[in-house]
């Protein structure tokens, strides 16, 4: 009897040991698979950023008289999109709020590049039907194949959501979301027709932000507006793939601009010129956004930052949220102190 019990005990122990071995091998296999996956994705990111060539813009109508529409074109990133697309041979339709800046940019580009530049000064924060009628009219009859949705607005300084001015909240949603969607919808029939006429592809680039990638305390409205553009761009990319129109969301971290209030560029904070150059050279490549559809993080330092966050703590983690909270709270405190000093001087 004792021998039988010992035998049963040994069998049970053997089974438990075997189960533990199987579990250990499963965990080991999953770990190896994850490491291989990360290594492949990292290698692909490096290839996208530094090795693989940029796109041939002939596929978007370059050399066929095609037009590119750029919103928010009078300053910063939008201005650079206009200049660099002009150098690639595209005619332009430039849309922005300040007519004097558009007139100046039009003269500069037409002198340097010998292309046709049309301008339209409208305030998209008003969300009037007249705006979209004017856009339709200025683009009427022109072979539009590229749309750069660059216009955007953020908070003047980081601010708690319940202290956000209603006017600022409404402007952010109207400019970043409503206007972007309405401009795209207004021009989309023309893009589809131009693609067929010129026998090329179309392109819609929309400016996203790390503020949308990472939920950002003290920029809650802006953060939500940019996160919306991620889902919208992904959905639109699926819809338009059969129409030969490429749709991409472009993610950026800090860039020297009026919106960021950063004046000096560095290795980690590019100028608009450097950022747009990397963007146009990365169309069709994911760069730092390897796990995301129809999305690119094109500038090298932004791409590395994105890759690390996505593959460590995660963009929706409490750790990432806490770091973002502390960072933007610090910015808010400095901005309030600066405003206080300026008020005392007056």
UniProtKB/Swiss-Prot annotation:
Keywords: Endoplasmic reticulum, Fatty acid biosynthesis, Fatty acid metabolism, Lipid biosynthesis, Lipid metabolism, Membrane, NADP, Oxidoreductase, Transmembrane, Transmembrane helix. GO terms for cellular component: endoplasmic reticulum membrane. GO terms for biological process: fatty acid elongation. Belongs to the short-chain dehydrogenases/reductases (SDR) family. This is Very-long-chain 3-oxoacyl-CoA reductase. The lineage of its organism: Eukaryota, Fungi, Dikarya, Ascomycota, Saccharomycotina. It is a single-pass membrane protein. Its EC number is 1.1.1.330. It comes from Kluyveromyces lactis (strain ATCC 8585 / CBS 2359 / DSM 70799 / NBRC 1267 / NRRL Y-1140 / WM37) (Yeast). The active site is at residues 222, 226. Pathway: Lipid metabolism; fatty acid biosynthesis. It catalyses: a very-long-chain (3R)-3-hydroxyacyl-CoA + NADP(+) = a very-long-chain 3-oxoacyl-CoA + NADPH + H(+). It is an enzyme of class 1 (oxidoreductase). It is found in: Endoplasmic reticulum membrane. Component of the microsomal membrane bound fatty acid elongation system, which produces the 26-carbon very long-chain fatty acids (VLCFA) from palmitate. Catalyzes the reduction of the 3-ketoacyl-CoA intermediate that is formed in each cycle of fatty acid elongation. VLCFAs serve as precursors for ceramide and sphingolipids. The chain crosses the membrane at residues 23-43.
């Amino acid at each position: 009897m004792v021998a039988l019990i010992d035998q049963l005990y040994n069998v049970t122990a053997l089974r438990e040991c075997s189960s533990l071995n199987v579990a250990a091998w499963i965990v080991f296999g999953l770990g190896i698979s994850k490491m291989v996956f990360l290594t492949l994705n990292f290698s692909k990111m490096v290839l996208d950023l530094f090795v693989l060539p940029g796109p041939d813009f002939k596929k978007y109508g370059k050399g066929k008289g095609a037009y590119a529409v750029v919103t928010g074109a009078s300053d910063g990133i939008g201005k650079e999109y206009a200049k660099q697309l002009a150098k690639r041979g595209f005619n332009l339709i430039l849309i922005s709020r300040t007519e004097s800046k558009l007139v100046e940019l039009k003269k500069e580009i037409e002198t340097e590049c010998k292309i046709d530049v049309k301008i339209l000064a409208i305030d998209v924060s008003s969300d009037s039907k007249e705006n979209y009628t004017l856009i339709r009219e200025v683009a009427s009859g022109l072979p539009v194949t590229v749309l750069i949705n660059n216009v955007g607005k953020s908070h003047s300084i980081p601010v708690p959501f319940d202290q956000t001015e209603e006017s600022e909240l409404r402007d952010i949603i109207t400019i970043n979301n409503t206007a972007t969607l309405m401009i795209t919808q207004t021009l989309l029939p023309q893009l589809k027709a131009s693609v067929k006429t010129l026998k090329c592809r179309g392109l819609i680039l929309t400016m996203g932000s790390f503020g949308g990638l990472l939920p950002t305390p003290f920029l809650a409205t802006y953060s939500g507006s940019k996160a919306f553009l991620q889902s919208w761009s992904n959905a639109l990319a699926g819809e338009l793939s059969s129409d030969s129109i490429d749709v991409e969301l472009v993610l950026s971290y800090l860039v020297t601009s009026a919106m960021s209030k950063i004046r000096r560029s560095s290795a980690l904070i590019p100028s608009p010129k450097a950022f747009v150059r990397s963007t146009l050279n990365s169309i069709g490549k994911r760069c730092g956004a390897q796990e995301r559809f129809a999305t690119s993080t094109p500038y090298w330092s932004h791409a590395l930052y994105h890759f690390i966050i996505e593959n460590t703590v995660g963009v929706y983690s409490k750790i990432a949220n806490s770091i973002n909270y502390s960072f933007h709270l610090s910015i808010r405190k400095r901005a309030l102190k600066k405003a206080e000093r300026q008020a005392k001087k007056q």
